[in-house]
Amino acid sequence: KELLDKGHHFSELSSGSTNQSELIALLISDKDDFVTGIENVFTKIKGSCSLLLLTENGIIAARDKWGRTPVIVAKKEGSYAVSSEPSSFPNLDFETVHDVGPGEIIQITADDMIRLRPATKEMPICSFLWVYSGYPTSEYDGVNVDTARYNNGMIMAEKDDIEADFVAGIPDSGTGMALGYAEGKGIPHRRAIVKYTPTWPRSFTPANQSVRDLVARMKLIPNRHLLSGKRVVFCDDSIVRGTQLSDNVSILYDYGAKE
């Protein structure tokens, strides 16, 4: 409403609502330069909003003021790259050189990286990166994803007093936790549920609940031979909407799991 009152016009829609990219672009263009424009975005947008802007003088990268979503800069001879997922760098021969801090704004050219706005100290980063959404080889602010998941499993095993025949993880992100649990508990790790990869990567992303249920059923295939008559610990981090959790419990019993 504030932008409309100033005479700005919205020409794009996304899923029947205001296009987020256009809204952010208008908030930036409402100020005199990119830095104050991005600061305007930080002030007006309540959620997390990290940005990459392609300008005539290079790329401007900005991490949201809370640091919830990562922005990582990598370098190789003669070029820079910016990504929210550092696992994209190694196979392209880039080396990570800088984790952009919360609220920090930098300008990148082929030859240099210039800080336009310093980072703030407060950073309630989203822990979901390490638990679920991050790629195992990635590191966010110096903490490796797979190591974090493995350590989570170790801690769970140390606090858990149940007896089980083996531990399994719901793939993919539950696998690292299951491996850590197996190490901490001293029991085998088995692949009692395997993911059928040519489906949706995330079962919580479809907007329709019936589609989410269908994807959940298609996505994971239990191994009856391993489950039958066994006491099994399952490490399942996929609890965004609970779609996988409710299905998995009933399926495990249907396939013969004892406990």
Regions of interest found by a model, annotated:
Residues K1, V167, G174-Y181, K185, ...:
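Extended, hydrophobic alpha-helical segments in both membrane/secreted and soluble proteins
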Residues D165, K258:
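Short acidic/polar active-site loop segments enriched in Thr and Asp
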Residues T55, S228, D236:
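A cytosolic small-molecule/anion-sensing beta-strand core signal
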Residues R68-T69, F89-P90, I114, G174-A178, ...:
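Flexible loop/turn segments at secondary-structure boundaries
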Residues G186-V233, G242-S246:
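Short, glycine/charge-rich flexible loops or terminal/linker lids adjacent to PRPP-binding catalytic cores
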Residues S15, V143, T147, A207, ...:
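Alpha-helix capping and helix-loop boundary segments enriched in small/acidic/polar residues
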Residues E2-G101, Q107-A164, I170:
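Conserved short alpha-helical segments that host acidic/polar catalytic motifs at enzyme active sites
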